[in-house]
């Protein structure tokens, strides 16, 4: 049996969006669980997602007032999934923002931060960059579903992801929500 898990990040409601796009319900049709990798901004986002499936979430750099952990591990069908936003610490966040504003964006740095957060996991899910990404570091699947909220420099459009987990092995797919 294959278990479907919805993966979402960087919703930024109501900071950048008034509400979640309606395409999320269709994208997450049939999922048993939704993992939110932070920058939620409002608990009503988790309530709305919770009408689709149970939600596990972590705090992002824009979630100062939400009482959520910065990272956690979830086990689904024998697959250990590390969930983090990916900004590491406030000090690192501000240093990286400065670097980016000076034209030194480095996706590898954020992937390293996310993967260094966990030991002994099969999948690491992160957000923060607003850039969809799917790669392996050794045997560990690194997956960033991109962002739901509009972004000032990304042209991929809003995206979420779905993990298909069978016998402890996860496959990830990116799901565009349309503009």
Where would I find each of the regions flagged by the language model?
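Beta-strand-turn-beta hairpins that frame and shape the catalytic cleft
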Residues: 1-6, 73-83, 136-142, 165-173
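Extended active-site neighborhood of metal-dependent phosphoesterases/phosphodiesterases
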Residues: 47-82, 115
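Conserved beta-sheet core of the metallophosphoesterase superfamily
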Residues: 56, 101-173
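Active-site-proximal segments of metal-dependent phosphoesterases and phosphodiesterases across multiple
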Residues: 12-15, 75-120, 150-154
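Short, flexible, glycine/charge-rich loop motifs used to bind or transfer phosphoryl groups or to couple energy/partner
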Residues: 22-26, 45-48, 71-72, 111-115, ...
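Active-site environment of divalent metal-dependent phosphoester hydrolases
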Residues: 13-16, 40-45, 62-68, 89-93, ...
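N-terminal active-site segment of His-dependent metallophosphoesterases
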Residues: 1-53, 64-70, 155-157
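Active-site neighborhood of phospho(di)ester-bond hydrolases with catalytic His/Asp-centered motifs
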Residues: 7-9, 33-39, 56-61, 83-85, ...
């Amino acid at each position: 049996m294959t278990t479907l898990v919805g993966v979402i990040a960087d919703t930024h409601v109501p900071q950048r969006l008034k509400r979640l796009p309606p395409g999320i319900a269709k994208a997450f049709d049939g999922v048993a669980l939704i993992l939110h990798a932070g920058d939620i901004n409002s608990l009503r986002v988790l309530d709305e997602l919770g009408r689709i499936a149970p939600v596990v979430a972590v705090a992002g750099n824009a979630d100062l007032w939400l009482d959520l952990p910065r990272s956690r591990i979830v086990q689904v069908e024998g697959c250990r999934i590390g969930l983090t936003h990916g900004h590491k610490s406030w000090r690192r966040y501000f240093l990286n923002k400065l670097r980016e504003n000076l034209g030194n964006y480095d996706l590898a740095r954020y992937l390293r931060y996310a993967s260094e957060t966990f030991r002994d996991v099969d999948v690491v899910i992160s957000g923060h960059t607003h850039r969809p990404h799917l790669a392996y570091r050794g045997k560990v699947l690194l997956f960033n579903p991109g962002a739901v909220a509009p972004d000032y420099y990304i042209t991929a459009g809003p995206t979420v992801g779905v993990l298909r987990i069978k016998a402890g092995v996860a496959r990830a797919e990116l799901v565009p929500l349309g503009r």
